[in-house]
Amino acid sequence: MVYYALMAKDTDLLTLVDRSMATHLEFMLPDGAWDNSWGTRSFKWTYWGGRTSDGFMGGYYAMAAQHPEYLEAIHRNIQLLKKTTSEGLLYGGMHYRVSGIAPCIHHTFGHAKAITSFLELPPLNITSSQELPRDKTYGLKYFKDIHTWLISQGPWRATFTGYDAEYKIKGTHPMGGALSMLW
């Protein structure tokens, strides 16, 4: 969407996408993981992001000149991808390999494609902000559209959700005021 908005010079769309990207960044954990514990498709999610999607790097990089914190998000997520890769294969989570859970080749080639596209972008001459929203201790944030609360207290990060939208497969995500993630 960012690429289209920039190419088409659609400032209305770019403003909308920019707001959406800033909100999404609220859900990145301090170690570069994406918290989609509350989402209707959280069963298709991994600790480092979407199982099969291209991810966020390209769009965030395209907007990094205006938002240096996006470079920090990309850096942290790449570090997390390195930690969850073994023998050239990307595992679905931090402890999958040591737990004997085999990697999925689809994760590997899906993200290799996205990272390759990202690496072909021209370098930016800006400095990362070094701080992301969930690095800060802020107490409680509420996201009305998804009826979800983020908590940041001391070293703890938590997500509570009352998001009761159903996906076509019933019972696939936490609902009704559940603790969906504790970090």
Regions found by a protein language model. Give the residues of each.
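Extended polysaccharide-engagement surfaces of secreted carbohydrate-active enzymes
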Residues: D12, E26-W183
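Active-site lining segments of carbohydrate-active enzymes
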Residues: M1-M28, G32-D35
